[in-house]
């Protein structure tokens, strides 16, 4: 790892924060993440707002697993590839916040039920009117797939465009990032060229937002007071960092 670029002391601090997030994130998944919406629907026969928890816990679990992957990539100087994974994490944060703050029953169809139906190959797509239809009875699904720009809320608008465009450059084959795949002599090279410390800052920024919006929210259950204190302290330390 290029310590001259990263700054060894700051690099260690950021590593410790990432490690702490993985530890607390995994614990939260184990003791708190449960499909409350699906459980209640199985009993009552109706879908309700508890599915918001299901979706947000899904995003949190997926993001925590992605954080572990990013840690492995960064340890192996695959910084550009870490940004590819980070883009998916950022999209998850936007969707999770959107469904939580803009909830209505229709969003459950768009975010949870219709995607499952479509993925199970129970529909066909009409290119002319751009709609999905059930194969069983030709009924149209009133499905809206939102792009990330449609789910920005509040202060996220102030930085979304710059951050998302930057992440997209690395997840697409954008020729603007060519220098990251060349050595000092202009030959193609698979070794990392990016400032790994900058990438870690972006990782901490995005995962902190996910952790803060799902874990350290009013009414969330912790299995003991110490765990609650550690989670709030972690968010504070990462934010101040």
Where do the model's predicted regions map?
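A cross-kingdom marker of C-terminal helix-rich interaction/assembly modules
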Residues: 1-92, 96-241
């Amino acid at each position: 790892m290029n310590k001259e670029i990263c700054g060894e002391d700051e690099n260690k601090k950021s590593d410790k924060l990432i490690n702490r997030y993985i530890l607390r994130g995994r614990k939260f998944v184990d003791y708190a993440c449960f499909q409350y919406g699906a459980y209640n629907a199985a009993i009552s026969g109706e879908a309700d707002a508890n599915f918001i928890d299901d979706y947000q816990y899904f995003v949190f679990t997926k993001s925590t697993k992605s954080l572990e992957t990013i840690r492995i990539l960064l340890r192996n100087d695959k910084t550009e590839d870490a940004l590819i994974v980070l883009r998916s994490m950022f999209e998850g944060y936007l969707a999770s916040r959107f469904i939580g703050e803009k909830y209505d029953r229709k969003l459950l169809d768009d975010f949870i039920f219709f995607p499952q139906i479509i993925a199970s190959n129970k529909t066909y797509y009409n290119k002319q009117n751009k709609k999905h239809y059930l194969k069983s009875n030709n009924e149209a699904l009133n499905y809206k797939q939102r792009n990330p720009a449609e789910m920005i809320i509040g202060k996220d608008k102030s930085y979304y465009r710059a951050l998302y465009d930057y992440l997209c450059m690395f997840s697409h084959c954008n020729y603007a990032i060519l220098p990251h795949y060349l050595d000092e002599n202009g030959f193609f090279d698979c070794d990392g060229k990016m400032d790994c410390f900058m990438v870690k800052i972006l990782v901490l920024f995005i995962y902190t937002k996910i952790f803060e919006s799902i874990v350290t929210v009013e009414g969330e259950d912790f299995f003991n007071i110490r765990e609650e204190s550690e989670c709030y302290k972690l968010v504070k330390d990462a934010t101040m960092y």
